[in-house]
């Protein structure tokens, strides 16, 4: 929670510090910025995750998936995004999938020798590295603690839904654009934040959380400027950001509405693929069924992830951070939990975008020795991969 006074008090009112300039302070080698270590940790975890998946796929229950590692990478909704990247939208029903990620795949696939699958994986990997870099940087701004920042990034990389960070899925791109937009908000670079939010609005419907963050940051800035009767230069940027931020999301929703000739066109299409908002009813029904009939392992594990996310959300509200970051996290979690009714097993993936939920856990783990943390993170990475494969083999959703 923000301390009294200025909403961006402490060091956050300043520009984010150039971390590489004070390498000695953070215990890193001179010339190597701390976020680079976060990106390298993320890369190492993804390699471990792919190795774990390669080991598990031919064995036990996972052999029923009948797929190789390459087939896994392009499975489930990956196929939808690849079709859109190559052929556009052949049917209006496909409009439920946002165009930003397929457009990025299409652009990379123009490079000679790169297949659509290779392009999709390239976008995912590059975006994941950018997200890890940004998350480490934001963590350093919020906490000033090197270990907490790196741990927060590592915990995001091993989150229960993180298997899609190694697949042709848009979550990595969404997280990368979102985290850098949040950094821009914290730095008060209003136009950059608005531009990135517009892009996020073409990638995923969860962009509504980022629009909320821009609103929570820009509106008070406008009110303060008006009360102080400040010059135009003090308030035009937050005003423009407030107006521009929703345009990506609203623009695509409007485009779909025109295509299907209904103002609620996108929401109707989402309902037709057994998704949409059920305001948590699917979770309540699963919980009731588990209490009455006893839970299956799939339901029990998924409900455990949901309960942990809810607890971390409440705990994160006690963390000091600008209100816009709290707004983003709350809306992401509420949107993830209110989405249903069919894909209960997709909740962990939906929650992956709540990147700051790892901050309380990172603080808790900080006192541990490095020789304890490294195997712990490795085990969590393997467990997360197992869980992702389990959801695909039993829960019918990555």
Label each PLM-derived region with a short phrase.
Residues 181-192, 365:
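Membrane-interface transmembrane helices that cradle and orient dolichyl/undecaprenyl
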Residues 123-127, 146, 151-180, 200-210, ...:
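Multi-pass, polyprenyl lipid-linked donor-dependent membrane glycosyltransferases
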Residues 107, 119-142, 308-315:
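Transmembrane-helix motifs of polytopic, lipid-linked glycan transferases
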Residues 45-64, 73, 211-312, 321-329:
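Membrane-lumen/periplasm interface segments of specific transmembrane helices
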Residues 242-246, 367-397:
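Signature aromatic-anchored transmembrane alpha helix within multi-pass, membrane-resident enzymes
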Residues 99, 103, 113-130, 296-303:
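Loop-to-helix entry region of an early transmembrane alpha helix in multi-pass inner-membrane enzymes
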Residues 136-158, 192, 323, 327:
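Transmembrane-helix signature of polytopic, membrane-embedded enzymes
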Residues 72-114, 279-285:
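Short hydrophobic/aromatic helix or loop-helix immediately within or flanking a transmembrane segment
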């Amino acid at each position: 929670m923000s301390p009294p006074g200025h909403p961006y008090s402490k060091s956050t009112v300043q520009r984010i510090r150039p971390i590489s300039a004070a390498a000695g302070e953070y215990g890193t080698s001179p010339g190597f910025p701390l976020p680079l270590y976060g990106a390298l940790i993320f890369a190492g975890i993804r390699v471990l995750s792919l190795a774990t998946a390669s080991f598990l796929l031919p064995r036990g229950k996972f052999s029923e998936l009948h797929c190789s590692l390459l087939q896994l990478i392009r499975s489930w909704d990956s196929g939808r995004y690849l079709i859109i990247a190559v052929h556009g939208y052949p049917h209006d029903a496909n409009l439920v999938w946002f165009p930003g990620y397929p457009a990025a795949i299409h652009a990379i696939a123009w490079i000679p020798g790169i297949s659509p699958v290779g392009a999709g994986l390239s976008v995912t990997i590059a975006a994941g590295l950018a997200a890890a870099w940004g998350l480490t940087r934001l963590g350093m701004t919020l906490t000033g603690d090197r270990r907490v920042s790196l741990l927060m990034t590592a915990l995001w990389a091993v989150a229960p839904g993180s298997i899609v960070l190694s697949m042709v899925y848009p979550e990595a791109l969404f997280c990368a654009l979102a985290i850098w937009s949040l950094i821009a908000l914290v730095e008060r670079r209003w136009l950059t934040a608005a531009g990135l939010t517009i892009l996020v609005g073409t990638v995923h419907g969860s962009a509504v959380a980022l629009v909320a963050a821009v609103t929570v940051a820009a509106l008070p800035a406008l009110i303060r400027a008006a009360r102080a009767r400040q010059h135009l230069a003090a308030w035009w940027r937050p005003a423009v950001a407030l107006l521009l931020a929703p345009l990506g999301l609203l623009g695509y929703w409007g485009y779909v509405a025109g295509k299907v000739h209904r103002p609620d066109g996108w929401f109707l299409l989402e309902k037709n693929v057994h998704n949409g908002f059920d305001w948590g009813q699917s979770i309540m029904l699963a919980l009731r069924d588990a209490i009455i009939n006893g839970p299956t392992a799939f339901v029990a594990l998924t409900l455990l992830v949901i309960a942990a996310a809810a607890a971390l959300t409440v705990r994160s509200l006690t963390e000091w951070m600008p209100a816009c970051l709290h707004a983003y996290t709350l809306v992401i979690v509420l949107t993830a939990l209110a989405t249903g009714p069919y894909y209960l097993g997709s909740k962990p993936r939906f929650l992956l975008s709540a990147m700051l939920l790892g901050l309380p856990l990172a603080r808790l783990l900080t006192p541990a020795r490095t020789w304890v943390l490294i195997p712990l993170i490795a085990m969590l990475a393997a467990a997360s991969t197992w869980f992702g494969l389990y959801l695909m083999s039993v829960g019918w959703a990555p």
